[in-house]
Amino acid sequence: MSFDVLTINPGSTSTKLAVYQGDKVLFEETVRHTMQEFADFNNVQEQFDFRWQVLRRVIDAFGYDVNNLDAVVGRGGLLRPVAGGTYMVTEKMLADLKTNKYGEHASNLGAMLAKKLADTLDIPSFIVDPVVVDEMLPIARFSGNELIARKSIFHALNHKAAGRKIAKKLGSDYEKLNFVIAHLGGGISVAAHRQGKAVDVNNALDGDGPFSPERSGSLPMNDFLEACFSGKWNKRELHDLIIGRGGMISYLGTNSMLEVEAKVKAGDEKAIQAFDAMAYQVSKEIGACSTVLHGKIDAIILTGGLARSDLFTSKIIEQTNWIASVIIEPGEDELEALNSGVQRVLAGLEKEKLY
């Protein structure tokens, strides 16, 4: 039996919507937003009514009768750490999102929009595998200093969706296999997945692991401390240097890997070195995760937008295919992943969780 599910993914520059009937897409739309549209909003929460109007306008334009919906699902926002799975949207969850208790991001609006529409139809609303999924082993939380614990912040939705897809292709279940999965995008996260749980992963947002097109990843601590107290930058500027303007931007002035690849193919020596270094660091992180799984790995999976680059993935494959076979599952279809999580719950294949 299949179910009609509306999926909502609010991003910093877009609102993505789709209605699925089972795994069939009835319609899908991406509405791009300009900075001018958000100019009068002081924070993400103030965008709620604007995003709600976008949602209603798109649904009306496609002529879809919302009374046919069985559930609504939104992209999970910044919440307290939770295990992976599909979560019912509750008042407790909404309270944390509305106050930005654990951080502010456009994805915080996902559950709020889903809940508002679902309540008018008397149907359930959900989120699936938010970025705060935390299944790390206790030993993996040690950073090397008691003041600071390692955190799990990664591309959980796409990691787990890719894991499920590849497990199915291998004739098994995600919960029965071991994978090292690398999401390659604006941020890069590499995780050891042991029988359905991401037991260790780099913090892809706050400075841990490989550098990416726009993030610095791990940095030598003493040198960074010198920069912090040099008087050249304030806290906000340093934050931007490591998260928004780090990585490839800091080396080559661009976060477009298409531009970087073009420079590499044109023989630009600096671009070649930076490109190779990023692939090297991803490969090294994959190797580290393989030790977490004691070398018992069913496959290494490369996913995310950068997994479409044959040049980039070939360098990773060359360094890691001795560990396990490398499978490429390019791109990230967040709407499909959101739908799949809810379809499993509605079909009784998986039980929803409470926040």
Curated annotation (Swiss-Prot):
Q: Which family does it belong to?
A: Belongs to the acetokinase family.
The record's EC number reads 2.7.2.7
Q: Which GO terms describe its molecular function?
A: acetate kinase activity; ATP binding; butyrate kinase activity
Q: Describe the reaction catalysed, as an equation.
A: butanoate + ATP = butanoyl phosphate + ADP
Annotated GO biological process: acetate metabolic process
HAMAP family referenced in this protein's UniProt entry, alphabetically: Butyrate_kinase (MF_00542)
> Where is this protein chiefly located?
cytoplasm
Q: Which InterPro entries match?
A: Aliphatic_acid_kin_short-chain (IPR000890), Aliphatic_acid_kinase_CS (IPR023865), ATPase_NBD (IPR043129), Butyrate_kin (IPR011245)
Q: What SUPFAM superfamilies does its record include?
A: Actin-like ATPase domain
Per the record, GO CC terms? cytoplasm
- Look at the named UniProt entry and state the broad enzyme category this protein falls under: transferase
* Localization per Swiss-Prot or TrEMBL: Cytoplasm
> Which keywords has UniProt assigned to this entry?
ATP-binding, Cytoplasm, Kinase, Nucleotide-binding, Transferase
What name goes with this protein? Probable butyrate kinase
